[in-house]
């Protein structure tokens, strides 16, 4: 419902965004902070703060950081896999999900909007 969505959004603003804000070491463009917030809401602020995207943002490379929300530096999709619950060769099996990859691509596009 719309009410539940609004409540969740307020919860994110109050609980997660102040923690996320401490991870940036410089003034952050709004589009970057918005997409970092989306990422943090989905994966946890600690994952976002420790991400390769955050490393790029804190180095002042806004576009690279935004790109890293969707792709590795090698061009492979990231943050687009789910665990299957199986373990193969001692490692958790991950399954690529096209819908998640599409979402990450959309977040990248939003993130770079208006950047210099």
Mark where each language-model region is.
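Active-site nucleophile-His-acid catalytic modules used for acyl/amide transfer and hydrolysis
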Residues: 14-51
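Long, amphipathic alpha-helical surface segments
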Residues: 3-18, 46-116
């Amino acid at each position: 419902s719309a009410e539940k969505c609004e409540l969740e959004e307020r919860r994110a603003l109050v609980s997660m965004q102040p923690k996320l804000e401490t991870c940036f070491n410089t003034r952050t463009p709004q589009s970057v902070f918005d997409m970092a917030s989306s990422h943090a809401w989905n994966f946890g602020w600690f994952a976002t703060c420790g991400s390769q995207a955050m490393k790029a943002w804190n180095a002042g490379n806004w576009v690279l950081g935004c790109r890293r929300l969707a792709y590795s530096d090698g061009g492979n999709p990231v943050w687009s896999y789910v665990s299957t619950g199986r373990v193969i060769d001692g490692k958790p099996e991950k399954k690529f999900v096209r819908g998640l990859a599409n979402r990450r691509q959309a977040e990248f596009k939003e993130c770079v909007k208006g950047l210099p």
